[in-house]
Amino acid sequence: MLKKIVTALGMSGMLLASSNAIAEDTTTKNDNLSPQSVDLSPLRNLNKLDSPMDKDYNYHQAFKKLDTEQLKKDMQDLLTQSQDWWPADFGNYGPFFIRLSWHDAGTYRIYDGRGGANRGQQRFSPLNSWPDNVNLDKARQLLWPIKQKYGDAVSWSDLIVLAGTVSLESMGMKPIGFAFGREDDWQGDDTNWGLSPEEIMSSNVRDGKLAPAYAATQMGLIYVNPEGPDGKPDIKGAASEIRQAFRAMGMTDKETVALIAGGHTFGKTHGAVPEDKVKQTIGPAPDKAPIEQQGLGWHNSYGTGNGDDTMGSGLEGSWTSTPTFWNHDFLHNLYNLDWKKTLSPAGAHQWTPTNAKPENMVPDAHKPGVKHKPIMFTTDLALKEDDGFNKYTQEFYNNPEEFKEEFAKAWFKLTHRDMGPKSRYIGPWIPEQNFIWQDPVPAADYKQVSTQDIAQLEQDIINSGLTNQQLIKTAWDSASTYRKTDYRGGSNGARIALAPEKDWQMNEPAKLEVVLTKLKEIQTNFNNSKTDGTKVSLADLIVLGGNVGVEQAAKQAGYNIQMPFVPGRTDATQAQTDIESFNYLKTKSDGFINYTDGSVSADKLPQTLVEKASMLDLNIPEMTVLVGGMRALDVNYDNSQEGVLTTTPGQLNNSFFVNLLDMSTQWKKSDKKDGEYIGIDRKTGKQKWTASPVDLIFGSNSELKAVAQVYAENGNEQKFVNDFAKAWHKVMMLGRFDVQQ
């Protein structure tokens, strides 16, 4: 069966884009780990170690020497320079490069921010060998002469997305802009890709539903099967899967329709090899290809192996009679032709018209004068038959200019969503328009606070009556929303004062309101007192308040520290905040404050701590010192005393590690509360402490214990405080792309 050879995937259609996501409680497969173990690999930045670039290499600086207009011209020239080793369909590589960009950017996951075009993961296994990325190895190879010419001045990540964007413009679809700024990885991302094709194709495993953490129907599949669910031409089922999959990357129904209809305006699919010859003629993917193929996979021994004999998804044909020009013929054909189910030469389910007229016929991609009937996927017909999608296909069909505009906006979102805020964009083609999915914050139209102002505000905070714990917890809750995967969240914007963050359980809304009310009062009084245009934002005050809390707690423990503070954060408005989108930043558990919403089993809590630390771009020592400090500071969620292993709660000292590693305490599971452990004095048998699995992992895991022992050693008390302060400042600065760090 074709499905067993190429897993029934529609690899040429622009509908398809891959899933690079994983549930929030794990980033890698932990099948070989015992329940007591924790996988620390997400905290190791091996990409920096594996990078061949000089240590002082800075992409933003290297980019300054790039001639972007010449790069664009070279890209435009490449589109029509057909190569014998991989001839261009219709003499134009544009549709091929659009698919390349789409499949690269389309891996984005809104659930955890993983995937997307940033970092160029499509170059590495497993993405480079996913069945749905068949033959895209050739597209990247076609780009190599351009990458070789411009070298370090342009990343692969930027080049791959630029290729699709320039292709669109060359074929009559003017994009709204393009931003450079994506940086390359140097190894494949060790991500949990979901169930295997064999598991997921079984109806008793998938039951017609997409796993929300992955969105794709199976590993290696880009979103949905174009033939229909499980390769069955079920239009209604296809519509349901399309909606779930595109929503999982943050797309609305309108954006979904624009992207699919616009993408399928161009190019063709490839299924020329007869079904009974596929197995013996199509070679393995790049990661299993013979060494002499030099990283190129899916060798095709049928006919010429390319051109009209190309084998890709198994579906065969084009959607429109003008596959290298932008128009709305896809929608015209969708509504004006009668579609009949048929099979491609490779045996894949597709649809052809029964009433095609000469003007509807599609030119052959390589043989002049030869014509074919247009095709549709099962998933294409879903755009007409589903009521929600039909609304927009009708709207776009009747309003071609609106269709063009909406596709341009959706394409920009698709290819830039994982880049984070607009402050990360570089280059000359950045659109002036702001979009809510960029999580915009207003530019400061006032003078920033001076050193003297900061000292005054610190004293105002100290005199406010707010406790150190209140200040520290609020600052943490604000800043720790950051995700390094897609650069969202963080303290900038003060969105902890807005919906939905202000109402999250972990932020303890009633307590949060008390703190915010007092800080807003300080802000108002200060701003009203200044006559020189100086102002302070609530976002800055929240962070400054946390700093004050840390400094005061250290002082109470006998240590004088000066927390660094960099003003410049501004306050977002509710209108600038997409509630649904921001709810994806809500964490199921935060081990730094011993919080869980109850959905994560106790034995998985240590791993979710690692996941949280990874999202905050922390390494192992930083995670360790922060947990130890937060426990000593007594800032657990709901005033929980689990892990507060100190007789001086609220003071910043190393008592958590000292007491955790003290052998006079014996730890036992609680018989009253799942996931709670009781620390008992070995001599008296009396209870001394309680702890969570997150706390005890620092004495159980050998690597974490080694770090914990450093902080528990005599003579390292000051080191602990200093390291905590550095790690705290790092978290507070996450998302501050407006400043050079």
Swiss-Prot record:
Note accompanying the cofactor annotation: Binds 1 heme b (iron(II)-protoporphyrin IX) group per dimer.
Site (Transition state stabilizer) at R99
Cofactors that this protein relies on: heme b
GO MF annotation, one? catalase activity
Cross-link entry Tryptophyl-tyrosyl-methioninium (Tyr-Met) (with W-102), positions: Y223-M249
Which Pfam families does this entry report, sorted A to Z?
Answer: peroxidase
Residues reported in the UniProt entry to bind heme b: H264
Q: Which enzyme class, named as a word?
A: oxidoreductase
Question: Catalytic activity annotated for this protein?
Answer: H2O2 + AH2 = A + 2 H2O; 2 H2O2 = O2 + 2 H2O
| GO cellular component terms, semicolon-separated | cytosol
Q: Which domain of life is it from?
A: Bacteria
Q: In its UniProt record, which GO terms are filed under biological process?
A: cellular response to hydrogen peroxide; hydrogen peroxide catabolic process
Crosslinked residue numbers (Tryptophyl-tyrosyl-methioninium (Trp-Tyr) (with M-249)): W102-Y223
Task: Name the keywords, alphabetized.
Answer: Heme, Hydrogen peroxide, Iron, Metal-binding, Oxidoreductase, Peroxidase, Signal
* Signal peptide feature range: 1-23
- Describe the family membership recorded for this protein in Swiss-Prot or TrEMBL: Belongs to the peroxidase family. Peroxidase/catalase subfamily.
Indicate what this protein is called per its UniProt record: Catalase-peroxidase
